[in-house]
Amino acid sequence: MRPAAILAAGALALLPGLFSLPAHAWDRQVKQGETLARTNCARCHAVGRLGASPLRAAPPFRELHTRYPVEDLGEALAEGIRTGHPGMPEFRFDPDQAEALIAYLKSLER
């Protein structure tokens, strides 16, 4: 194999790591998102991997990715969600909180 090809293959192998969080940062973000979900959302939504939502109209968080692209919720979370399910109060999160909540939602997809 030529040196240029080896260099290109090595660069491609490292590329995904440039755009992802280190595992400990991801875990911390997921934990923060879980805390936000339990504090702000668990009265109506099932926020864990199991169980029904206390409010029937509120979808379980583990199923949200089947309804919406979870990555697209960042703007709605930052601007304030006003229309979710019937009776849903308005929530507004700062960008870091929105990112943490999205990380938690994505962790439920696995």
Outline where the language-model segments fall.
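Gly/Gly-Pro-rich "capping" loops immediately C-terminal to redox-active cysteine motifs
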Residues: 32-34, 48-78
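Bacterial N-terminal signal peptides
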Residues: 8-20
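Positively charged n-region of N-terminal signal peptides that target proteins for export
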Residues: 1-4
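The canonical Cys-X-X-Cys-His
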Residues: 33, 38-47, 101
